[in-house]
UniProtKB/Swiss-Prot annotation:
It is linked to Lethal congenital contracture syndrome 2: A form of lethal congenital contracture syndrome, an autosomal recessive disorder characterized by degeneration of anterior horn neurons, extreme skeletal muscle atrophy, and congenital non-progressive joint contractures (arthrogryposis). The contractures can involve the upper or lower limbs and/or the vertebral column, leading to various degrees of flexion or extension limitations evident at birth. Erythroleukemia, familial: An autosomal dominant myeloproliferative disorder characterized by neoplastic proliferation of erythroblastic and myeloblastic elements with atypical erythroblasts and myeloblasts in the peripheral blood. Disease penetrance is incomplete. GO terms for cellular component: apical plasma membrane; basal plasma membrane; basolateral plasma membrane; ERBB3:ERBB2 complex; extracellular space; lateral plasma membrane; plasma membrane; receptor complex. This is Receptor tyrosine-protein kinase erbB-3. Autophosphorylated. Ligand-binding increases phosphorylation on tyrosine residues and promotes its association with the p85 subunit of phosphatidylinositol 3-kinase. The modification Phosphoserine is found at residues 686, 982. Monomer and homodimer. Heterodimer with each of the other ERBB receptors (Potential). Interacts with CSPG5. Interacts with GRB7. Interacts with MUC1. Interacts with MYOC. Interacts with isoform 2 of PA2G4. Found in a ternary complex with NRG1 and ITGAV:ITGB3 or ITGA6:ITGB4. Residues 665-1342 are cytoplasmic. The active site is at residue 834. It comes from Homo sapiens. SUPFAM superfamilies: Growth factor receptor domain, L domain-like, Protein kinase-like (PK-like).
Length: 1342
């Protein structure tokens, strides 16, 4: 069985190595190491040989042919030219061994300890079948080992071979006996040396026929026909490239004694530096890189690192490096989740040489004293020393029992970190209790306890712990993390002298002596505190770095009275002990050290400085002149000045011709690559339909092969898979197209992506300027979706990094483009499910594209359900119906669109920052929403609020959103106000550039892949504009006044949807001309503003949110079954009619002034036509936000920017604020809420109260106010406010700092109708729904 397993492993290695090219395109295959052991019958053995050696040229190992039948066809062995190990032929019945091309047997492994060729017992005693010929006609070299050919009854001509001409080692044993006797003679042309009777079977002699001048092989008898010294097996000429085989290594066809070394000597820096042309030894071949299943050990390719080295990855190269002690070894711990509950005699040996414990370590009394119930004997205390190698414990350390004769825990003297990833009992990461004989802790190397509490109790003899400063060990806050009690009192310890060593600092110590200090008062050497380092005396001399003593380099000469060195390098010595080569002290001058152009030789002068030898010295020297060279004297060939001049001129001409040719070739390849890249990016494929009755669909995506895609690095990971940066290498092409590869896997394992589905074809057929087009897909066990690589990254990262360079025009244009992309997806029936700023990518600084759509529908239904335990579910971007019922529609995407726009307007703030995800659904049910961003007017904010309506049918469509943002993008400063901060006396600097030139070059050129991505801009007909104009702010943005801000920043908070006095406050401040804007709504709790870097951290469910799943399941169980109102019902149409009925007709589509990218430019509407604000989706009125009903049944949305309408006159303006019944923001008061009925209320104007000290120039209006003619000075139509008796929503007063309230205004107070109950936020409460939707006036309750 063991031999069979070995064959299977070698077969696997063969399949990996087969077909690889090394050296001169040699087909390399692995050998075997089974000896005379065989598995199965002769037929099975033959099949194994065939799989291993078909078309093989170089056998990396041993060629073993054992127990093969007489009718076996071994002609597949004829290609073998070299065997690195031995050749074993035994117990076979075939007549001829066809190895006519075998030239060299290296003998790196020998059979029976001494034979490179072993042939024995190749006959059948019951038949005439036997081995008769060894056709090794080309075998001319056995580098190591002897020959054994015995007991082959029918094998002939073996005694005619001159084995000394083949075997290099003269002392090698050669045994040839007891073989065939009745053999025909050799052919006369062979002169008695042959492998068979024919004239073609003569032995080729390459040594014994050579002239005496030849040291090895030759290709003729003349003295000038000697082979190169590096040849093996003969040659066809005198050069190292004429060898039949190489004695040592084959470097690109030339035989060399060693492969190019990884380090070469630099004459300028006097250092060994990495050789850019290094190669590694792979068998007898020099290769530029080892096969993927090998690692580099110094200069060789090996299958595994030796025991004292570990495998590391350096710049993508797997290498073996010394461990510097014990090599890292991770071991399983004890406790919860482990097979063992405690360390005991049954598992203690499993911790030998462990450096890292994955889990916990528990020391209980049942482990040390034994467990009779489980028949586990007592633990030998001496075996606890295996833990001296442990440096890290990822979980906790629990010591509740310890051997009586051990008075500390010094077996953990090398422990540096306790991770606390899993905690014991009440959250302890270090627990030491009831160890009656322990006097000190002894954790001398412990530097960090990452998490958890410390419990040290009931250790009657324990001292020294009183002195420890635990804040230096604990990470994070230390309050309430220490529970140390009932140990030996401090006064008793002091009385017995059990105090810290005087060399310890005030940080305390773990035990007695200078080696147990937490930190040192002066210096430390090897973890032991000392008074001073050996600066001026003592051995070895030292220098100090961060109060740590380090030894000087061994080549530094110890100095008296002054410092010997100032660092650890050989170039930091004050004086060298032996020689100095440049700035470095060395033990000897370089002698034959490999340099960039050959070996380097130097000699020491009288000052022991290393000086270079003459350039013609090839074996060293003793001086600078040519006559000082060691060895043979070289004859110099004089050259005239004319010859030198002609040589230089000819060289320059050749160089210029090569440069010109290279440039032309490079340009031609560049043009070809551009054309090929354009062809592949633009061209789609027609894929046959899955149903024969369907028509073939034009699918823009391709079906890739796995060999065409190459992943370079991981860009990120999300809910459905991992995104890689990679390249697409079309089959048969040499171009590399940069792409993004998203690997989608079904975690349940129930779905395979082997077949191409209709949904995959649907995704592949999508093509729009504002969605990331799918270039293709690669089916398989995991589905790979391939899109074009956009180096500018996500829109979320962009707005965070360049918030100081983003203007309102660009922000609104991005909103238009995202809406257009989502509208295109809606037209094609594609629900996104995960729209967020992180899933919007920048194709250019002015064009964005929606990405990551349609991925969820590729997985089975169970995997698309909302799982609160999933670590990356975007709860904060999801609509309520998606959170509670797993319902995803285009209108749930509208909700996510509103959150995405909010992210843009807050420059990448995290939604609901500071809130646990379990609180978000309840918060949304109560009617609270994200707060109004600081740069947004009420118009823009109301568009967001409409996207967050409870009833999905009331939310706008993406077409309406695109039209609305297009309208706003024509006058950006009117809707977005961005104020730049500048201090007094500081002139505002130039507007910062959004991107550096380097990043812009990355958009056009990917240097790593040698591609010009400027082609993408040409394909899309993008205008070549500078980045400064793309990111510039409109004129006047910097000087627009800003209102006062709330003390609690709303940019990262949320807003209750039922703030009754918000509109009134805003109206009053806007109408009165005050420079102070109305305070923004704030959250119930202060929330810190924050933003995280990855998709998995931005508002996604974490492991600590397990309670949310329970809440949702309870909410679902209580919810009533309701049929959602279809989009086509009367209420929906009436609302859409009110939103889309234009007052002034819009310009036809052909005249719409925007570019192909949806980038709308300001001030482009017709001069003679006033811009209409009612023809597109407008901002919702406060009464709509608050859940009240309008008087007019046909109009359920109130426009914030009203025109003069022919309507019945308003009621007379009240004479006082008390008559209005309004409730204003209570500055400085506590937050309160009220909830009333859902009766409709009429609109009343707001009285204008002038504020002292304000001027008309300070006034800034968000809305387009037109004269209404209603009352004195009233040129503004107030938004609807209800008296207290008619309000059907909550009112909230926001905190505001002192000084923001006009002193002369008196505010009326409203009494709340009833307090908010818990059932008001439940889905099964009809009052909740009717209080937050916008039904018609005659809507019936259900």
């Amino acid at each position: 069985m063991r031999a069979n397993d070995a064959l299977q492993v070698l077969g696997l290695l063969f399949s990996l190595a087969r077909g690889s090219e090394v050296g001169n395109s040699q087909a390399v295959c692995p050998g075997t190491l089974n000896g005379l052991s065989v598995t199965g019958d002769a037929e099975n053995q033959y099949q194994t040989l065939y799989k291993l050696y078909e078309r093989c040229e170089v056998v990396m190992g041993n060629l073993e042919i054992v127990l093969t039948g007489h009718n076996a066809d071994l002609s597949f062995l004829q290609w073998i030219r070299e065997v690195t190990g031995y050749v074993l032929v035994a117990m076979n019945e075939f007549s001829t061994l066809p190895l006519p091309n075998l030239r060299v047997v290296r003998g790196t492994q020998v059979y029976d300890g001494k034979f490179a060729i072993f042939v024995m017992l190749n006959y059948n005693t019951n038949s005439s079948h036997a081995l008769r010929q060894l056709r090794l006609t080309q075998l001319t070299e056995i580098l190591s080992g002897g020959v054994y050919i015995e007991k082959n009854d029918k094998l002939c001509h073996m005694d005619t071979i001159d084995w000394r001409d083949i075997v290099r080692d003269r002392d090698a044993e050669i045994v040839v006996k007891d073989n065939g006797r009745s053999c025909p003679p050799c052919h006369e042309v062979c002169k008695g040396r042959c492998w068979g009777p024919g004239s073609e079977d003569c032995q080729t002699l390459t040594k014994t026929i050579c002239a005496p001048q030849c040291n090895g092989h030759c290709f003729g008898p003349n003295p000038n026909q000697c082979c190169h010294d590096e040849c093996a097996g003969g040659c066809s000429g005198p050069q190292d490239t004429d060898c039949f085989a190489c004695r040592h290594f084959n470097d690109s066809g030339a035989c060399v004694p060693r492969c190019p070394q990884p380090l070469v000597y630099n004459k300028l820096t006097f250092q060994l530096e990495p050789n850019p042309h290094t190669k590694y030894q792979y068998g007898g071949v020099c290769v530029a890189s080892c096969p993927h299943n090998f690692v580099v050990d110094q200069t060789s390719c090996v299958r595994a690192c030796p025991p004292d080295k570990m495998e590391v990855d350096k710049n993508g190269l797997k290498m073996c490096e010394p461990c510097g002690g014990l090599c890292p070894k991770a071991c399983e711990g004890t406790g919860s989740g482990s097979r063992f509950q405690t360390v005991d005699s049954s598992n203690i040996d499993g911790f030998v040489n462990c450096t890292k414990i994955l889990g916990n370590l528990d020391f209980l009394i049942t482990g040390l004293n034994g467990d009779p119930w489980h028949k586990i004997p007592a633990l030998d205390p001496e075996k606890l020393n295996v833990f001296r190698t442990v440096r890290e414990i990822t979980g906790y350390l629990n010591i509740q029992s310890w051997p009586p004769h051990m008075h500390n825990f010094s077996v953990f003297s090398n422990l540096t970190t306790i991770g606390g990833r899993s905690l014991y009992n009440r959250g302890f990461s270090l627990l030491i209790m009831k160890n009656l004989n322990v006097t000190s802790l002894g954790f001398r190397s412990l530097k960090e306890i990452s998490a958890g509490r410390i419990y040290i109790s009931a250790n009657r003899q324990l001292c020294y712990h009183h002195s420890l400063n635990w804040t230096k060990v604990l990470r994070g806050p230390t309050e309430e993390r220490l529970d140390i009690k009932h140990n030996r009192p401090r006064r008793d310890c002091v009385a017995e002298g059990k105090v810290c060593d005087p060399l310890c600092s005030s940080g305390g110590c773990w035990g007695p002596g200078p080696g147990q200090c937490l930190s040192c008062r002066n210096y430390s050497r090897g973890g032991v505190c000392v008074t001073h380092c050996n600066f001026l005396n003592g051995e070895p001399r030292e220098f100090a770095h961060e109060a740590e003593c380090f030894s000087c380099h061994p080549e530094c000469q110890p100095m008296e009275g002054t410092a010997t060195c100032n660092g650890s390098g050989s170039d930091t010595c004050a004086q060298c002990a032996h020689f100095r080569d440049g700035p470095h002290c060395v033990s000897s001058c370089p002698h034959g050290v490999l340099g960039a152009k050959g070996p380097i030789y130097k000699y020491p002068d009288v000052q022991n400085e290393c000086r270079p030898c003459h350039e013609n010295c090839t074996q060293g020297c003793k001086g600078p002149e040519l006559q000082d060279c060691l060895g043979q004297t070289l004859v110099l060939i004089g050259k005239t000045h004319l010859t030198m001049a002609l040589t230089v001129i000819a060289g320059l001409v050749v160089i210029f011709m090569m440069l010109g040719g290279t440039f032309l070739y490079w340009r031609g390849r560049r043009i070809q690559n551009k054309r090929a890249m354009r062809r592949y990016l633009e061209r789609g494929e027609s894929i046959e339909p899955l149903d024969p009755s369907e028509k073939a669909n034009k699918v823009l995506a391709r079906i890739f092969k796995e060999t065409e895609l190459r992943k370079l690095k991981v860009l990120g990971s999300g809910v459905f898979g991992t995104v890689h940066k990679g390249v697409w290498i079309p089959e048969g092409e040499s171009i590399k197209i940069p792409v993004c590869i998203k690997v989608i896997e079904d975690k349940s394992g129930r779905q395979s992506f082997q077949a191409v589905t209709d949904h995959m074809l649907a995704i592949g057929s999508l093509d729009h300027a504002h969605i990331v087009r799918l270039l293709g897909l690669c089916p398989g066990s995991s589905l790979q979706l391939v899109t074009q690589y956009l180096p500018l990254g996500s829109l979320l990262d962009h707005v965070r990094q360049h918030r100081g360079a983003l203007g309102p025009q660009l922000l609104l244009n991005w909103g238009v483009q995202i809406a257009k992309g989502m509208y295109y997806l809606e037209e094609h029936g594609m629900v996104h499910r995960n729209l967020a700023a992180r899933n919007v990518l920048l194709k250019s600084p002015s064009q964005v594209q929606v990405a990551d759509f349609g991925v969820a529908d590729l997985l089975p239904p169970d995997d698309k359900q909302l799982l609160y335990s999933e670590a990356k579910t975007p709860i904060k971007w999801m609509a309520l119906e998606s959170i509670h019922f797993g319902k995803y529609t285009h209108q749930s995407d509208v909700w996510s669109y509103g959150v995405t726009v909010w992210e843009l307007m807050t420059f990448g703030a995290e939604p609901y920052a500071g809130l646990r995800l379990a609180e978000v659904p309840d918060l949304l049910e109560k009617g609270e929403r994200l707060a109004q961003p600081q740069i947004c007017t009420i118009d823009v904010y109301m568009v967001m609020v409409k996207c967050w309506m409870i009833d999905e049918n009331i939310r706008p469509t993406f077409k309406e959103l695109a039209n609305e943002f297009t309208r706003m993008a024509r006058d950006p400063p009117r809707y977005l106000v961005i104020k730049r901060e500048s201090g007094p006396g500081i002139a505002p600097g130039p507007e910062p550039h959004g991107l550096t030139n380097k990043k812009l070059e990355e958009v056009e050129l990917e240097p790593e892949l040698d591609l010009d991505l400027d082609l993408e801009a040409e394909e899309d007909n993008l205008a070549t504009t500078t980045l400064g104009s793309a990111l510039s702010l409109p004129v006047g943005t910097l000087n627009r006044p800003r209102g006062s801000q709330s003390l609690l920043s709303p940019s990262s908070g949320y807003m209750p949807m039922n703030q009754g006095n918000l509109g009134e406050s805003c109206q009053e401040s806007a109408v009165s001309g005050s420079s102070e804007r109305c305070p923004r709504p704030v959250s119930l709790h202060p929330m810190p503003r924050g933003c995280l870097a990855s998709e998995s951290s931005e508002g996604h469910v974490t492991g600590s949110e397990a309670e949310l799943q329970e809440k949702v399941s309870m909410c679902r169980s209580r919810s009533r079954s309701r049929s959602p109102r279809p989009r086509g019902d009367s209420a929906y149409h009436s609302q859409r009619h009110s939103l889309l009925t234009p007052v002034t007709p819009l310009s036809p589509p052909g005249l719409e002034e925007e570019d192909v990218n949806g980038y709308v430019m300001p001030d482009t509407h017709l001069k003679g036509t006033p811009s209409s604000r009612e023809g597109t989706l407008s901002s919702v009125g406060l009464s709509s936000v608050l859940g009240t009903e309008e008087e007019d049944e046909d109009e359920e949305y109130e426009y914030m920017n009203r025109r003069r309408r022919h309507s019945p006159p308003h009621p007379p303006r009240p004479s006082s604020l008390e008559e209005l019944g309004y409730e204003y923001m209570d500055v400085g008061s506590d937050l309160s809420a009220s909830l009333g009925s859902t009766q409709s209320c009429p609109l009343h104007p707001v009285p204008i109260m002038p504020t002292a000290g304000t001027t008309p120039d300070e006034d800034y209006e968000y809305m387009n106010r037109q004269r209404d003619g209603g009352g004195p000075g009233g040129d503004y139509a107030a938004m609807g406010a209800c008296p207290a008796s008619e309000q059907g929503y909550e009112e909230m007063r926001a905190f505001q700092g002192p000084g923001h309230q006009a002193p002369h205004v008196h505010y009326a107070r409203l009494k709340t109708l009833r307090s908010l109950e818990a059932t008001d936020s439940a889905f099964d409460n009809p009052d909740y729904w009717h209080s937050r939707l916008f039904p018609k006036a005659n809507a019936q309750r259900t």
